[in-house]
From Swiss-Prot:
It is a peripheral membrane protein. It comes from the Bacteria. NCBIfam families: membrane protein insertion efficiency factor YidD. Transmembrane segments: none annotated. Coiled coil: none annotated. Pfam families: YidD. InterPro entries: Membr_insert_effic_factor_YidD. The keyword Transit peptide does not apply. This is Putative membrane protein insertion efficiency factor. Belongs to the UPF0161 family. GO terms for cellular component: plasma membrane. Could be involved in insertion of integral membrane proteins into the membrane. It is found in: Cell inner membrane.
Amino acid sequence: MAQTQSPLQWLATTFIRGYQIFISPLLGPRCRFNPTCSHYAIEAIKVHGTAKGCWFALKRILKCHPLHPGGSDPVPPKNDRCNK
C-alpha cells in the first residue's frame, strides 16, 4: 500500500528531485556520504515528516565539507516514544 504524502512533503521532495535532475549533473559528484545528501533528505522527509526531515537534511548538508571524512550515514529510524 502506498504511503500518502502531505502537500509540504510533496513540495519538499519535488524541489529536491528538481535539484537532482537539473543542478546536480552540472556540479558533478561531490557528496562524501552514502547515501548522497539529496537522497538522505528525501528519505528523512519520508520517515520523519517535513519539518524534522528538513532539519536532519540541513544538519547533514552542513557536515558535507572537505574536512569531514564522510562515509555511511543512514537516516536515523523514527523514534516512537508512545510505544515504549
